[in-house]
Amino acid sequence: MARKLFTPITIKDMTLKNRIVMSPMCMYSSHEKDGKLTPFHMAHYISRAIGQVGLIIVEASAVNPQGRITDQDLGIWSDEHIEGFAKLTEQVKEQGSKIGIQLAHAGRKAELEGDIFAPSAIAFDEQSATPVEMSAEKVKETVQEFKQAAARAKEAGFDVIEIHAAHGYLIHEFLSPLSNHRTDEYGGSPENRYRFLREIIDEVKQVWDGPLFVRVSASDYTDKGLDIADHIGFAKWMKEQGVDLIDCSSGALVHADINVFPGYQVSFAEKIREQADMATGAVGMITDGSMAEEILQNGRADLIFIGRELLRDPFFARTAAKQLNTEIPAPVQYERGW
């Protein structure tokens, strides 16, 4: 039987050499606080391309300075960010990998000086600052910031854009009734709470014609929060809008007890794939080749997003291939040690 983990897949006009995706993970290493890449970021991402990851998604990159989680996050709110990202995309592609970027706004979870913004003036928790409720004008302005960031991503040479609509950040805050108490067109019904994301997708697609992913938190793990049924509905709308894949994570909107175990989020990817007829990515405690292969062989997801395991092992692709008794090509420079 062919090992599906190492079978190419084409999404829109992009072909990945395998189904392994480096999940976006914040490194909090833009130490000049200007949102720019550092030598660390270059080494971090290029090393995973050398390690034969099919698709590398750069960590959450803020569309606005006040949309960072911390002041050491990456940003793509300025044309000054394009040059650094262009150098990174060129180097990653030289190693045969594709590269994406996650466009993000932290919303009420921003830990920054000055005002932070959210759909409603509801703090994340008792230790967090209370955000300013966004005016309708501010909402429209933020939608345009996502569009402008997407245009910069295209200029920088990225292959994929992922919109971050998960983990309790701004878009997730609009989607969930726990954090969105608005009474205007952006609050109330599921259609209204989805409107912010709908407008972002529509605007991004005006300047971006490549593969478009959206990361979601498929469960809030708490009463009256979002659950998988809600996200199946959202996924159907995303498909209508031309989103190519949903990256299925969960949680982090509110503090909640989560039963974490290997592959604990895979069922979300499976259900969205089946019930919304949508390509999905599985993520969360997927740590070996056999687990990844099972998910793919059983049609539970289309891509495997690997996070912490790629921090521990930049050569996860090689490790997984050995676990599956298959061979993958080595970088020419590494052939004698592969």
UniProtKB/Swiss-Prot annotation:
It catalyses: A + NADPH + H(+) = AH2 + NADP(+). Its cofactor is FMN. Its EC number is 1.6.99.1. Inhibited by p-hydroxybenzaldehyde (pHBA) and p-nitrophenol (pNP). Substrate binds at residues 28, 164-167. GO terms for biological process: response to toxic substance. The keyword Flavoprotein applies. FMN binds at residues 23-26, 60, 102, 215, 307-308. Disulfide bonds: none annotated. Pfam families: Oxidored_FMN. It comes from the Bacteria. Keywords: Detoxification, Flavoprotein, FMN, NADP, Oxidoreductase, Stress response. InterPro entries: Aldolase_TIM, NADPH_DH_bac, OxRdtase_FMN_N, YqjM-like. It is an enzyme of class 1 (oxidoreductase). CDD domains: OYE_YqiM_FMN (cd02932). GO terms for molecular function: FMN binding; NADP binding; NADPH dehydrogenase activity. Induction: By toxic xenobiotic compounds (2,4,6-trinitrotoluene and nitroglycerin), and in response to oxidative stress (hydrogen peroxide and paraquat). Catalyzes the reduction of the double bond of an array of alpha,beta-unsaturated aldehydes and ketones. It also reduces the nitro group of nitroester and nitroaromatic compounds. It could have a role in detoxification processes. Forms a charge transfer complex with a variety of phenolic compounds. Homotetramer. Composed of a dimer of active dimers. Belongs to the NADH:flavin oxidoreductase/NADH oxidase family. NamA subfamily. This is NADPH dehydrogenase. It comes from Bacillus subtilis (strain 168).
